[in-house]
Curated annotation (Swiss-Prot):
Disulphide linkage map: none
GO molecular function: structural constituent of ribosome
Organism: Variovorax paradoxus (strain S110)
Keywords linked to the UniProt accession: Ribonucleoprotein, Ribosomal protein
UniProt keyword Plastid, yes or no: no
Name of the protein this chain belongs to: Small ribosomal subunit protein bS16
UniProt keyword annotation of Ubl conjugation present: no
GO CC terms: cytoplasm; small ribosomal subunit
Single GO BP term: translation
Length: 87
């Protein structure tokens, strides 16, 4: 089964997450199929905190990839922030 989930990066105390498509059996920070974007929970006000390639996300969902609950929350958060960025 293919899943869309977070892969942790960054250093101790400064987390940074890549939003990746991977096989469910592969470890969290292991091999992945494609990187769709990132989430930076410690971003400052002038830095971008979430970026998701919406076209690739739609493709992977169309072929049956399941998003984790946290990634679903981030997708909604990115969609809400997108109109503000365009203005």
């Amino acid at each position: 089964m293919v899943v869309i989930r977070l892969s942790r990066g960054g250093s101790k105390g400064r987390p940074f997450f890549n939003i990746v498509v991977s096989d469910k059996r592969v470890r969290r920070d292991g091999r992945f199929i494609e990187r769709l974007g990132f989430y930076n929970p410690t971003a400052k006000e002038n830095e971008e905190s979430i970026r998701i390639a919406q076209d690739r996300l739609a493709y992977w969902k169309s072929v049956g990839a399941q998003a984790s609950p946290t990634v679903l929350r981030l997708i909604k958060q990115a969609a809400a922030a997108a109109p503000k960025a365009a203005a």
